[in-house]
């Protein structure tokens, strides 16, 4: 039995994208929650290429007296999970907590995650209670959660909630992974020895709109399927086998009917033959597209380009410095 190391410092990683309205309240509430921990702490804000004044507000917060805020500025938008990975590469805590900037997951839940992690868990996930999202978002989330559970075999209730806690060894291991498409909650669970979930409150979004549109949710679902499991390829092989057997059986049936009923019947069955042909062609194109997606991801991973470009990091009471990039 392995004993978990004591938690001496907590790092809170928050990706920010056009959240200027919620940032002041986010910083205030997160700071208050961290001060109640009785441990050392830091807050890392990662600007994911915001077009509003989010970056300026972050820099100002880092430069205040007695600030515990580190601001990381990416040169453009790379996506939520890439921004979080950028934050992971700068943390110094023993326990790292991720939190969205929209305040739908209350920062006041942070002490509960820390207390649960203190029980020896490597990963502490959360399940949103009484979700305040639209029916579309709730339905899409249920489909994605079910899809993840079926394809990865990792049974957790709410993969879409980013309010989560990870011990430092899990973070260090994830940073050594170089996949271009990364879904952090699943990747962490792959390496976790002990994982659990706790229920948390969920509030309505007070400022701005959700950054996940319908198309982004569709792309997220497709990314999850193709970057985390080879199950679709296995299903494709199974589907191909079924179609091949069905096609062979249908061919035998058509030959028998042709011999039994004569050429008159064969002429009248032309449209059915076309329908069967188009079905097979459609299945082939679907298979080719899926294989192409996997090959494209392999190509991107082989090139090993950095996930993001860190333009600037602002530490409390320090001078900003520039980094070239980070994988």
Swiss-Prot record:
Which stretches are Cytoplasmic in the membrane topology?
1-235, 291-327
**Which Pfam families does the entry link to?**
Glycos_transf_2
What Enzyme Commission number(s) appear in the record? 2.4.2.53
* GO cellular component annotations of the record: plasma membrane
The UniProt induction remark is:
Induced by BasR.
Which GO terms are recorded in the biological process aspect for this UniProt protein?
4-amino-4-deoxy-alpha-L-arabinopyranosyl undecaprenyl phosphate biosynthetic process; lipid A biosynthetic process; lipopolysaccharide biosynthetic process; response to antibiotic
Please provide, alphabetically and separated by semicolons, the GO molecular function terms listed in this UniProt record: phosphotransferase activity, for other substituted phosphate groups; undecaprenyl-phosphate 4-deoxy-4-formamido-L-arabinose transferase activity
Compartments in which it is found: Cell inner membrane
Q: Where are the transmembrane segments?
A: 236-256, 270-290
NCBIfam families named among the record's database cross-references: PRK10714.1
Q: What is this protein called?
A: Undecaprenyl-phosphate 4-deoxy-4-formamido-L-arabinose transferase
Which source organism does the UniProt entry give?
A: Salmonella typhimurium (strain LT2 / SGSC1412 / ATCC 700720)
- Gene that produces this protein: arnC
């Amino acid at each position: 039995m392995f004993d978990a190391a004591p938690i001496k410092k907590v790092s809170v990683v928050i990706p920010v994208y056009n959240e200027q309205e919620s940032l002041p309240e986010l910083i205030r509430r997160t700071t208050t929650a961290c001060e109640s921990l009785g441990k050392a702490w830091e807050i890392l804000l990662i600007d994911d290429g915001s077009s509003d004044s989010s970056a300026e507000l972050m820099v100002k917060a880092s430069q205040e007296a007695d600030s515990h805020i580190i601001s990381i500025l990416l040169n453009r938008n790379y996506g939520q999970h890439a921004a979080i990975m950028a934050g992971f590469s700068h943390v110094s805590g023993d326990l790292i907590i991720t939190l969205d900037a929209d305040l739908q997951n209350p920062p006041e839940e942070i002490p509960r995650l820390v207390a649960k992690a203190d029980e020896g868990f490597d990963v502490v996930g959360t399940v949103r209670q009484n979700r305040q999202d639209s029916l579309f978002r709730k339905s899409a989330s249920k489909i994605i959660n079910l899809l993840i559970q079926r394809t990865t075999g990792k049974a957790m209730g709410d993969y879409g909630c980013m309010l989560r806690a990870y011990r430092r060894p899990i973070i260090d291991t994830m940073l050594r992974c170089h996949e271009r498409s990364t879904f952090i909650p699943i990747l962490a669970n792959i390496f976790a020895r002990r994982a659990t979930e706790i229920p948390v409150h969920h509030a309505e979004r007070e400022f701005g709109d959700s950054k996940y549109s319908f198309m982004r949710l569709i792309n997220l679902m497709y990314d999850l399927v193709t970057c985390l499991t080879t199950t679709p390829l296995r299903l494709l092989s199974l589907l191909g086998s079924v179609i091949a057997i069905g096609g062979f059986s249908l061919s035998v049936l058509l030959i028998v009917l042709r011999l039994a009923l004569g050429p008159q019947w064969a002429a009248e069955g032309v449209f059915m033959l076309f329908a069967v042909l188009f079905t097979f062609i459609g299945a082939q194109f679907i298979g080719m597209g899926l294989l192409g997606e996997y090959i494209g991801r392999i190509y991107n991973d082989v090139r090993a380009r950095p996930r993001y470009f860190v333009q600037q990091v602002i530490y409390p009471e320090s001078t900003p410095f520039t980094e070239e990039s980070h994988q």
